[in-house]
Amino acid sequence: MDRQKGELRLDFEEFAFKGGESELAAVIPGNPEKSELMVRVLDHGDDRMPSKGDPLTKAQVDTLRKWIEGGGKYAKHWAYMKPEKSPLPEVKAKERVSNPIDHFTLARLEARGMTFSEPADKAHWIRRVSLDLVGLPPTVEQLDAFLADDSKDAREKVVDALLQSPRYGEHWARQWLDLARYADSNGFQADQLRDSWAFRDWVIEAMNADMPFDQFTIEQIGGDLIPKATFSQQAATGFHRTPTCNVEAGVHPEENRVNQVFDRVTTTGTTWLGITMECVQCHSHKYDPFAQEEFYKIFAFFNNTPLEVKGKGGVSFDFWGPTMDLPSDKGQKNQKQAAETALKAKEKELEAAKRDSEAKFEDWLAAERQKLGKEGSAPLWTVLKPTQWKSSGKESFTLLDDNSLLAGGMSGAKSIYEIETEAPEGKLASVRLETLLHDSLPSKGPGRNRTNGNPNFVLTEVTLSLLEPGKKPVPLKLTRAKVDYSQGNFSAKGLIDGKRDLRSAWAIATEFSKPHWATMDLAKPVEPTPGSKLLFKLEHLYGGGRNVGRPRFSASSEPARQPALPKAIADLLRKPKPTAKESKKLLDHYLKGDEELADLEKAVAAAKKKVGQVKVASTLVMVEMDKPRETRVMARGNYLDPKQTVSPGTPTALHPWKKEWPANRLGFGKWLVDRENPLVARVVVNRWWSQFFGSGIVATEEDFGSQCEPPTHPQLLDWLAVEFMDNGWSMKKLHKLIALSSTYGQSSRVTPELLEKDSDNLWFARGPRLRLTAEMIRDNALRISGLLSEKMGGPPVYPPQPDGLWRQTGRNEPKYAAATNEDRFRRGVYVIWRRAAPYPSFVNFDGPDRSSCHPKRSRTNTPLQALTLLNDEAYVEMALGLAIRVLEDKTKAELDERLSYAFRRTLSREPEARELAVLRELYESELARLRKDKSSSKELLDGIKAIKFSAKLDPNQLAAWFFVANTLLNLDETVTKG
């Protein structure tokens, strides 16, 4: 350990009996006189233990001596001992027992002078169990059928039907995806999107099929290593291809890979073992018997992966693999063939245009040589000297010897430069703006981005005016803007289009640290009178101080339809007999300036992009390298400081490795779910129990180590763990057992007595009452509104969210286009999960960003949550959906019947008289207001464009019902399981 000087530990038996550097055993069982621990405790010199504070009392020393005399036995931490079934405890209230679970919980209650609460009524129970098993409330039809069923097995029939529903896997996958840190993007600042949704679908399908949990584990850890692995088994390994991946500039690919392997080790520890492994990558565990070397033994199982990023010239990286193609349908193949045919046609057209252009090359040479004239003739561009300048921001400017202006001071957020220059003599046909470098600029420039210090600029608009003596300024229209380079999604045309929006601009990422230029022709050339000035206005409206750092202006008497000749090209033109290599350079330069060719090249690029867009979908999978990597312990987790070599292995504090297991991920998966493992079944059962009751039998679901909360019902936890394994690791059988227990079926009503005796419901004296998770709240409202789509699987979906949320997030800023079809109303498990910007309503209800393994979500209560339910576009649509359902399902019903129907759809119970009265008053007051203000209903309904309804519905009634529905969806009871 990092503070341990003599390598002696007394917290674990093997270390105490072994001793430290002195090789003297701290504890010799039965012999206190020879035990170094007693020698140190009784010492009065520098070797006394404890070294600081008061010495042990005589009573404490006597206790220590008796303990050593008795054999110095250490009690092993309960979680590291194999679970065993204990006999079912006897209880007094036998009539309240429905299955073995109740023996354990009721016995604990009776020992405290307590008993179960009364059973929940049928309406509350079916809503609770439906929410727990499928994440959705029952339909009115399901509710009525259950209420009418008086058979003894009525509840069992409901549970069986829910377990067989495909909605079961969709609901329970959510918790596993939190553990798997599943997301549709890389994470970090770049946060590019990536395809891994096939793994999400695999989890849903596996849970619906009740795949035995041991097989579920093995396939995720090492499914690709199973002999003749199926597509499904390979897709399962996506579990460990979901870590974040940093592809930003400055990241070392090997460091990135090592960090991902660290993540795989710690996530495995949390998910299956309930062990906090993060600290062990740097030092041995402070509280549990896991040495740093053992961390790297597990690391070795996952260390045979290839690099998962590829570089772009050292500036940045792309996440790329390994991947596996998904089975494609005929339609995809036809689309790809059509796109490839279109690409070939464009490529032929481009080749023909190149041949035509090359035929005119000699004419171009002659014309350009004539322009240049003899050696030493005047250059094409005349540099203009600035005479006045100012900025709307806080910039100051310094005029340099080359007539450029160097910006200094703070870079304004959205600065507008106004720079006057001398006008050229004679004809003015075009102007040029150069953005030059300087040592004082970030990375030498050419921009002054103050947001993150990189040298980018975003120039939104350039305007030019002629200032003649004694006359008003004359705006000069600019056309045909050309630049030497422009960042993707930005173009030269934006400089002069007058739009002034964020994307209509010129930017130069990632071509930093080099000068750039832009040329613009005048729509009508002018001849300034002597003494005239030119006024250049440079508008930087993007924000963040992304301003030009050192502008210089030039003018020409000729249009700048072709880019200005670089000096190297001009020098070659002046040569009477250029070499073949030099002639090739001239030809290449000429072809680059051909606008027709440029347009065709863009068309070819677009066709190539389209081919890429219809590529066969793929998914991320684990792949083993042919030659295993060498694994070394890394000092303090630093990949640049490797120490001793280690082989794959497992912690000695847990069950031993079997010889028949291969020393790879597949073998490690089998070790995890071996019945001798004391942790996995306990950890998994405890986590599922928490989903039903709100808290695990062990409250620290992520930590079963020595610092964990002790189990409230240890015998129950062990009984469930063994029962789980005995039943073939069946998830559904365990869930059925919990759902049909009297413990689960109690009323959740809280009495003063229960608050006093069991305020946190640790002893399960009442049923669970919990706020729903983020996805459940949305899914619940979709089901209530009648909008829910039951379409399963496939790529992530894009429900509505506030505009522009993704605009400033991630590299290349992928656009968020809200779905307009049924994908808009699909379940939360399918919603796009972007780590840098998760779906906002999920965030508001405590959804994680999934940048790491997340074993348990928090439950907060904030005003923002109520505002989300009232005003979020998705919930507004759902409120209108519910209003339409009420009017269309109950066309001839009276008001109270409609209100009761809406209430039952929402809460699965009949409203009380006072509740009905409140809703009636709300509806009638809103209807009166809407009839008085005739435009309000139309404005409301016209604004909810995604929801279609019959023109036969009265708009005032529909709008009034919208407000009733909006209120029902925002009730605390609606978003609570009780």
PLM feature spans:
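Exposed low-complexity, polar/acidic, P/S/T/G-rich flexible segments that act as propeptides
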Residues: 433, 446-469, 533-535, 539-543, ...
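Extended surface/linker regions that mediate inter-domain or inter-protein docking
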Residues: 67, 154-292, 298-303, 434-436, ...
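Primarily the internal scaffold of c-type cytochrome electron-transfer domains
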Residues: 7-16, 21, 73-87, 194-196, ...
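Surface-exposed, glycine/proline- and aromatic-rich loop segments on solvent-exposed faces
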Residues: 415-417, 422-488, 492, 818, ...
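Extended extracellular/luminal ectodomain segments enriched in beta-structured repeat modules
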Residues: 424-430, 528-535
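Disordered, acidic Ser/Thr/Pro-rich linker "stalks" and the adjacent N-terminal cap
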Residues: 368-416, 439, 465-530, 631-656
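Primarily short, surface-exposed interaction patches in extracytoplasmic proteins
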Residues: 92-128, 132-167, 181-228, 289, ...
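Solvent-exposed helix-loop boundary motif
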Residues: 1-65, 69-107, 111, 123-128, ...
